[in-house]
Curated annotation (Swiss-Prot):
Pfam families, per database record: Spermine_synt_N (PF17284), Spermine_synth (PF01564)
Catalyses which reaction(s): S-adenosyl 3-(methylsulfanyl)propylamine + putrescine = S-methyl-5'-thioadenosine + spermidine + H(+)
Summary of subunit composition and partner proteins: Homodimer or homotetramer.
Upper lineage: Bacteria, Pseudomonadati, Spirochaetota, Spirochaetia, Leptospirales
Source organism of the structure: Leptospira interrogans serogroup Icterohaemorrhagiae serovar Lai (strain 56601)
Residues annotated to bind S-methyl-5'-thioadenosine: 33, 108, 139-140, 164
Main subcellular localisation: cytoplasm
Molecular-function GO term, any one: spermidine synthase activity
Any one GO CC term of the record: cytosol
Protein name: Polyamine aminopropyltransferase 2
Record localization: Cytoplasm
Keyword Transferase: yes
Annotated residues for binding of spermidine: 64, 88, 157-160
Amino acid sequence: MELWLDEALELKNGRALKIKVKEFLHSRTTPFQKIDVFESVGFGRMFTLDGVVMMTEADEFAYHEMIVHVPMMSHPNPEKVLVIGGGDGGTVREVLKHPSVKEVHLCEIDKGVIDVCYEYFPEIANAMKDPRVKHAYEDGAKYVKDYQNYFDCIMVDSSDPVGPAEVLFKRPFYETMANCLKEGGICTTQGESFYYHGSIIRELFNFIPEIFKHCGYYYTVVPTYPSGIIGFTYCSKGPDPYTVVPDPQRVPQGLKYYSAEMHKAAFVLPQFAQKHIVRK
């Protein structure tokens, strides 16, 4: 009997992602969500939260490299970094590729995600065991309130704006992040797909330009995410990632997606998507 995963995230809009499953490996329900792990035929090992694909071994690098290296390469000397969400460890792994980093705070509300990823995705998750990484299992929107003028870079590696992640797409959270960043600090947040989620993106850019010196949107290509595209909002109190010319000598070795050229290209949006964005 063939097994297939049908991702239901876009089902109400008449769209679905179907992935052939080789083996069902694990399932658990935490106080926050249901976590499932599969061995897929075409994308390697993968996990879902409440039936929505979060990561696969085959394409995770495209997301993790772009959420991290665009802000990190735009900042002249990122030493203190905050990752909100990101319990799979991929974002932390990429952050630690920058030798300037002295301290990484990982704020993941659901410890169950980290535990599952340690067991089933050790090559990705073990980066979270680095001694520079400080773990906090709490709401990221509350965590940032405890730090003022502290972080050089913040990456909000969140799920979609439902349930526990909904607050991470609201104005008060962005205002608190601005206070949390040092002068010259930069943050990036998971910004949905400009094909499917234009209304969410427009809502974000109704208030982000009022809070930050620079802001805008860029994207990456991930086959197992809705529409195959996932975007990021960037917000900066200092350098503008859109105009920064990355130093090729600072680009970490061994990357699969990010490069100095890709950094520049990621900001080029199709005309229909530009109407959702305010670049400042």
